[in-house]
Regions:
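Residue-level signal for mature regions of secreted extracellular proteins and peptides
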Residues: 24-25, 489
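Cytosolic catalytic domains that perform sulfur/thiol-centered chemistry
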Residues: 33-498
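Sec-dependent signal peptide recognition
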Residues: 15-22
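N-terminal secretory signal peptides that target proteins for export/translocation
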Residues: 1-14
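A periodicity- and composition-biased signal for non-globular, repetitive helical segments
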Residues: 9-10, 23, 395
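C-terminal motif of bacterial Sec signal peptides marking the signal peptidase cleavage site
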Residues: 29-30
Length: 498
């Protein structure tokens, strides 16, 4: 038997109250009848606690040097490396495992392992994403399924309940900060506790001399032993609410494209102003655009708005009510693309402008103003094109600020696909009466020619829900089945009927 305690508040379907128990049996609270949030079906007891975004979030110390998880500094890592058994955080009894997304520069290639209780593995972002079906559409770059995660734990011999896992960039860059975030997100989503998980602040080119000296680096990484025995099924936190499905996002959008203060949500687009506006406005330097003297500029005469499109999409723009501030503002390029201080991130999220004038803007392309961004009690929804850039805004929100945060993992590559607009075959991607049309709740500009629009893999345009990824993850933890990777997986029946 599995006992499941749902401590989450909210009314979304995609992972908030709906949980697939053993054999897809119905929870009374989700399917009607009864008053409890636990499955008491018999047998040995296994309690899985469903965590709300507010419980998953963690607030960083004002000074990152004081953190022992979440955002950690090179100085903290140095203390651990010098005497791991003596200096490891309270509650950690296992190994120190560093996942580097890339090789660092010459002389600082890898955080130096001792291969006894400190290990460093090269683990690119491709290991932490997977093409998945949500029951409606096949979407790239989603959180990996259970079998994929277990294969990673086996490959690197990770004990996620006892080891300290540090996601690092290697060479610091915007792309590697995204990869670092994907590592953190996948592990946290699957139930690794905050105390066991950290992100190293800054790339190797900067931390070499700023917290670590040259002796702390090695030219080679540890060899993956492929001897791990622990499964994500042993992790008893259900953190699937960290992911927002397209259904969840549709359910929280306002009735028009405006910033609604006090509605309990802040939706943050991590992309450029050009992508947010579908080319109606640009940022200085965007697409080689020369600065206009401000932070939001009208495009030059004759500008081709299709330059803002990605992944051969049918349209470009944003969901109604979204605020935009590009992810790069969260990082300090002079410090190996480390996160900026917490106070600066708090100011950005409040709506305040920085010294250069960059701030959250709304659908009018005007700054919302200090105090009109994040509101206490809001849940922050973050996205970009494939939720790589949004890993940085999401970490800023969830790991630094400690705000309840959900990652729309399907992102704009999924959102813009769910449209009654033609692809290169001339056929609309979704039928006019599909309930999953996101074009009806979006500002957008259609692709200039359907010939540029790639075909999408639609699984079921009339699916009852779009939470197959969530259900599969919850079911896998209970010992049922695998995942939706690869192609066109058949949507499982609704365990509650209908």
């Amino acid at each position: 038997m599995m006992r499941r305690q749902d401590k989450r508040a909210g009314n979304g379907i995609g992972g908030w109250r709906f949980w697939a128990a053993a054999g897809f049996s119905c929870l009374l609270a989700a399917c009607g009848g009864g008053s409890g949030g636990e499955d008491r079906s018999g047998g040995s007891v296994k309690t899985i606690i469903a965590r709300a975004p507010a419980e998953i979030a963690q607030s960083s110390a004002a000074d990152y040097e004081d953190n022992v998880n979440g955002i950690v500094t090179a100085a903290r890592l140095n203390a651990w490396m010098s005497n791991w058994t003596g200096n490891r955080p309270a509650g950690i009894t296992g190994k120190l495992i560093v996942f580097q997304a890339t090789v660092g520069p010459a002389g600082a290639e890898y955080i130096k392992p001792n291969n006894l209780n400190v290990f460093t593995y090269l683990s690119p972002s491709s290991e932490w994403v997977q093409t998945r079906s949500n029951g409606v559409i096949l979407t790239p770059s989603m959180v990996p399924d259970g079998p994929t995660m277990d294969a990673l734990l086996k490959k690197y011999d990770v004990d996620p309940q006892n080891d300290m896992i540090v996601c690092a960039m290697g060479t610091g860059s915007t792309g590697n900060a995204m990869a670092q975030g994907r590592c953190w997100y996948a592990l946290r989503y699957w139930g690794v506790q905050a105390k066991n998980l950290a992100l190293l602040n800054g790339g190797n080119q900067w931390i070499n001399g700023n917290g670590l000296d040259a002796s702390r680096f090695a030219a080679t990484a540890s060899n993956a032993p492929n001897t791990g025995l622990v499964s994500v099924k042993s992790l008893l936190d259900d953190n699937t609410s960290l992911q927002a499905t397209v259904e969840d996002l549709l359910n929280v959008l306002p009735a028009r494209d405006q910033n609604v203060v006090g509605d309990g949500v802040m939706i943050w687009d991590a992309r450029s102003t050009g992508q947010f506006s579908a080319g109606e406005r640009l940022e200085p330097g965007e697409n080689s655009f020369t600065a206009c003297g401000g932070t939001v500029c009208a495009p030059p005469s004759g500008y081709d708005y299709m330059r803002t499109f990605q992944n051969n999409g049918s349209r470009q723009g944003h969901p109604w009510g979204t605020l935009q501030l590009q992810f790069t503002r969260m990082l300090d390029s002079t410090k190996g693309y480390a996160y900026k201080p917490k106070a600066e991130i708090a100011a950005y999220m409040s709506g305040a402008a920085d010294s250069a004038g960059y701030a959250l803007i709304d659908g009018s392309y005007q700054p919302v103003g200090a105090g009109a961004g994040y509101q206490p009690g809001d849940t922050v929804y973050v996205y970009c094109e494939t939720t790589f850039r949004a890993m940085i805004t999401g970490v800023a929100s969830a790991v630094i600020m400690g705000y309840p945060t959900r990652f729309y993992d399907g992102a704009m590559v999924e959102w813009s696909s769910l449209s009654h607009l033609p692809d290169a075959t001339g056929t609309p991607i979704l039928p006019a009466n599909s309930p999953w049309r996101t074009d009806v709740k979006s500002f957008f500009r259609q692709a200039a020619s359907a010939t540029s629009v790639a075909t999408r893999t639609i699984i079921n345009p009339y699916a009852t829900h779009a939470n197959q990824v969530i259900l599969e993850g919850q079911s896998y933890k209970q010992g049922n089945g695998g995942g939706s990777g690869g192609g066109g997986t058949v949507t499982p029946g609704n365990p509650c009927g209908g």
